[in-house]
Amino acid sequence: GISLADPPQHLPSDCPEHLVSVLQKCLAPDPAHRWRSGAELASQLELCLNPRAQQILFPASKSWFTKLKGWEVPLVVLIVAIPNILAGIFNFFHNQKHIVEHLKNSQDAFWKIQSAINMIAYPTGLGLIGWLTWLLLRFAADSETDSKSDLQKSIVMQKRCLRLGHYAALICTAEWIIAGIAYPISMHYAIGSLPATAYIHFLGSLILCGLIAASYPFFGVTYFSLHTIYPRLIQNSDFTQLAPDSYQQLKRLSWVYLIMAFLVPTLSIASLAMINLNDKIAIGILTVAGTLGAVSIFRVFQTLQADLDALEELSRRVHSSLK
């Protein structure tokens, strides 16, 4: 005989993999393995009519997002680390050239202070982000083995997953601000009182670099988690649990970070032009990197908005049909 678990033959090449799974579950020999209600089946069929949402919530087995299973934590950490490390390198050379070189006997102190701060800040921030990611994955793994997982907690974890990029950006920004305060205070105790402009320059440069670096983790982590972690959280639960408002909130947040991605580099360039008129290298780096980065972020922003529109439309249609 033919097993219902085997892939059906003679299907169109563009037949969605999830539609096949839905129909196979309808024909399961054991009633306990079928859909629990007509409403649940209707929701699944509604999903099949929304290809974009379907690809996000139930990615094909050959999708590269599916193949990344098990690598979520290191990849999220890497997405956050790269822009922050690049911003840190730029900030280090900028501060050394425009602040430290003009202070007597400050080179050794600056090296020791920046080494200490970086050795604390980067592992702490990246470790915290990795831990938040791991919590989501652990809940997803527990849900796979426990068919009676807490519905309310499942909704909370789904919302946390959607905001993972926002949390990453907030953690990064907070650490840059703390570093902006720690650098001048540490330098003050190491070599004595600094000029007032040095305190302002340290704080301002670190805050601006932090705000520039914050947009990249938001878009990178949000897009990645939406396609890799979020599907795992809803695999064994009703994907209609989340109200459309959750997607709308994330769309509004995306606009905030998009504006930040374009505005902050422009403000940084303007500040450099006013304070250091001869610093053509820094202005050039910010101009080129800011432009390329903003264009890249805009592309991700457009894709993310389309993904969220599809999920919001699906959620709205399913919720309206259940009323």
Which residues are covered by each model-predicted region?
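Regulatory extensions appended to serine/threonine kinase catalytic cores
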Residues: 54-115
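C-terminal lobe helix-coil module of Hanks-type protein kinase domains
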Residues: 1-52
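Alpha-helical membrane-embedded segments
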Residues: 125-128, 202-221, 280-302
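Juxtamembrane "helix-exit" motif on the non-cytosolic side of transmembrane helices
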Residues: 89-102, 181-196, 266-278
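Hydrophobic alpha-helical transmembrane segments
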Residues: 105-120, 193-208, 270-291
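Interfacial "cap-and-anchor" motif at the non-cytosolic start of specific transmembrane alpha-helices
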Residues: 258-312
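Loop-to-transmembrane boundary segments
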Residues: 65-79, 155-181, 242-266
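Cytoplasmic membrane-interface regions of multi-pass membrane proteins
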Residues: 53, 131-166, 192-193, 219-251, ...
